[in-house]
Every structure is written in structure tokens, then in C-alpha cells.
Amino acid sequence: MTTHQKQLYVMLMKWIHYIWFQNVDIDLSKRWIDIVGNWVEKNGTLWTIAHIKMIRNVFTRFICGQPCKRVDMILGIDKDGFPKVLKPYKELTNSQAGRRYILTLLSISRCLPGTKKPDYSTITKPSAATEDILKELIAYIPIFMERYSIKPFGVIRWTQDDLHYSVKSGPLGPSTLTAQADMYKARHLLPAWKKMAMFVPIILEKLMDAIPEKSALKFTSLVLGKEEPVNKPGFVNVTRIREKELKDVTRRLSIVDDPEAKARVVAIFDYWSQSILRKLHLRLFELLETFKQDRTFTQDPYIPRRLGHKYHSLDLSAATDRFPLKLQKELIAKLISGPYAEGWEEVLVGTPFITPEGDSVVYNAGQPMGAYSSWATFAVAHHMVIDYAAFKEGLDPQSDFYILLGDDVVINHDGVADRYRNIMSSLGVDISPLKTHVSYTTYEFAKRWFHYGKEITGIQLAGFMHILESGLNMRSKKWVDKQMKKCTAKSGRA
């Protein structure tokens, strides 16, 4: 960390102190910035990020009343389970503002640059789900649907009118612009598409006759009924697909670099598969809206307190990669009649995915995030697992003892939480014991922390640092001055 970067952090913390933490000595922030700077210089950013994450985890376990005594890293912890490096800040834990301040300091790890190679083993490793739990849950699907008054969707009809503009990326380039190329390269998926939408082969054969494979793209005008993209003189024709770009690829994996050196794997599908999946995607999101415990649309983190029960903030490891596709397929089969579920499975995982390194990988347990319907299907199946645990505990399906957002879940019922852990373990989905928090007073949901019903989430430094650095970059490059000169010149006021 350079001297200039340290100065930026101090500048930012002075402002944050003025707005939120006027009663906290600014020297405490300066001390922490110096410590982090020394760690970066001596050990690098990746080590520093991992170290701060562990400190944060030990700290949150402390305020949960579930202190860590030992961790898999060289880290000083006192007899109370508090990180020794934070000793000067320990008194601040007696107030809500103090806890929030410490979490603010610990969010500095999200500002540090760093990347890691993605781990594909969670994708390729065969499922560890037991046959017994799969049979139990598959048999429970009709009961789950009855408890939540879920009616089958019936037949999902897809026609040419359901084609849409997409701003997403496809395996060959921008999705809509490369739809014509996808149409030829993904022909091996026609049997699967037919199981999901019987008229797809007829429609595509008609389109293939109208649009030659290597001609200028007429997809927007012939299929969508829209005007073709306008091209300025001197620019490359954006509607032309060059022969060298037409690789035999219909599935790719893209890596998104998230904060704290995380590598998130996102699957990229061809335009036609996405278009056919989109109708199921919309129906599943309508279904998710009916679950009072679901937070997809609100991200509302509040959960009613149940006396005598603890909050269980459960951290799932690679949930979507490991949660059995077989169970999700059976759920889809109960929602949609005919061979739709078989086609859905073939479209999602029947074709290998090409990684950025050029390797080919296959999903052997769960399913890829990135396709329409994939996330929503997992979310509904996740609700079903919790409801199965609740059913075993004799609870009503509309009880508000948990909140859920995809793979993020907080359960405020000890019996349900214990059963849930056992079920997920039997399904081959790991729950991190170190990152999971169990407390009568505190819980974490969607990266937000609550203590005695009050939010203590730290101020996220990364967003402010990005704005601050962007502003300084523009100023140093005199970008604003250049733009102002252009504007005044055009207006005749130069």
C-alpha cells in the first residue's frame, strides 16, 4: 500500500468519522490503516485479505456470543475469543455504534485488489447426495406443493413471438447479434428444445432458410421485426458475423472477479436456449413472490424473534454447484407436464462448458448459474428443503421462522435448523462451521448484520474509495477540463 493510498484511506475515514462516528477517536482508524498497510507490504494483498476475513469472522463470532478459541490461521485470540489485533477497540463493542465502527474498519479487505484462479472442482466432482434423502425429498414434492397451494404450470407454450432482445453475452459474442450463428452451432440441442417447446424445430428450420449462416445478420429485422442497427461510415458493420468468429461453441464459463479475491463462475448460454428457458424463468419468479419468507424482491433482512430459539445464519459452500440437479429436475417435472424437465436438464448440463483457459468441464452434481430459470429453480427447491425440515417439526408452512434469498438463509428455530443441517449434509452440500453463526442476539443476512434487532452493518469503504479514486483520476488527467472545453466550444462560448 503506497503512502498516497494510505492518505486516501485516512481522508475517507475522517469524512466517515464526521458523518457517523464523531465520538470515536480518528487515531484508531489511522492505526488500523497503518497495520493493514504493513501487512500488504510484507505479505501481499491475498494474504492480507484472507487475514482480515478471518479477523472479521472471529469478531462476529464474539459478538454472537459464540467465540472462536482456535482457527486455521496464525491469529492471536484472547481468552474471551476476541482478536488480539483489535484489543484497542474492544471497549467499543459495548455499543451498537462501536460494533458498527469495527465492522466498518474490517470492510477494508473489500478495497484491496487481488484475484485467484477459479476452482472448478465443485462443478466437476460427482454429487455426494444419498439415494435415501433424494427419495424422501422427491416423495415430498407433492406435499410441499399442497402446503403452499402451488398449482402445476401445465404446458408452457413457446412461439416465435417469445423471442426477445437481450443485452447479455452469448458464447460467440453479444447474444442478439450472434443469435443467427447460435442457431446453426446449437443444432444438436434441437431434440432437447423440442421437449420444452414442440414448435421450435419448425420455427428454426424456417429461419435457417431465410438467414444463411455466414450472411449479414438479418435477425433483428426478419425475426424481431425491428430495424437493423445503424452503422456510421467508417465503422465496422456490427451486424456482420465473420467466419473466423463462428467457432463450434455453444457453452462458455465466464469468471467475474468479486471483492476479496473471489472468482465467481457464470455460465453463458446460446440465445435460443435462453429464449426458451425465459418463460419458465418468469413463471418461477412469480412463484417465488408467493413465499412470504422469500426475499428475492425486497432483500428485507428482518425476521421476527421467536422466544427460546436462536438465529442460525448458515453459510453454504458452493451451494448451486453441489445441490443435486436430480432433485431440481423432479421439482420441474411436477410443475410442468410432459418431457419438459428432461429437455430442461439436457439444455442446462447436457453440453460441456469451455473455460477461459480453454478446458472443457461438465456439471456433475448441481447446475450452472447464468441460464434463465437456474437461480429461481434452486431457490424454490431450497424453500422445499426448509419446509421439509419444518414439516418434520410439525410447523405450519406459512410460519415466519426463516428468511431466504437464493443460497442465503437465516433460520430462527433450533429444531428446523438442526434438521436442515442434516438434510443438506445428506444432499452433499457443505455448511461451513466456522462461517456459520448461531446466536440468541445476532444474525447476518445478505452481508448485513443485526444485533438485538438493530442493524450494525459496517459502512462499506469499497464504494466510497472507488468514487474517491475515480474523481481524483479524472482530476489528474484533466478529464473534466477537457469535457468542459468541448461543451463550451460547441455552444459557441469558448
Residue map of PLM features:
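Non-catalytic, polymerase-adjacent accessory regions of viral genome-replication enzymes
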Residues: 1-255
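Acidic, glycine-enriched catalytic cores built around paired aspartates
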Residues: 2-6, 49, 96-98, 124, ...
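Surface-exposed, low-hydrophobicity interaction/linker segments
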Residues: 210-211, 216, 221-232, 278, ...
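Reverse-transcriptase-like RNA-dependent polymerase core
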Residues: 239-261, 342-359
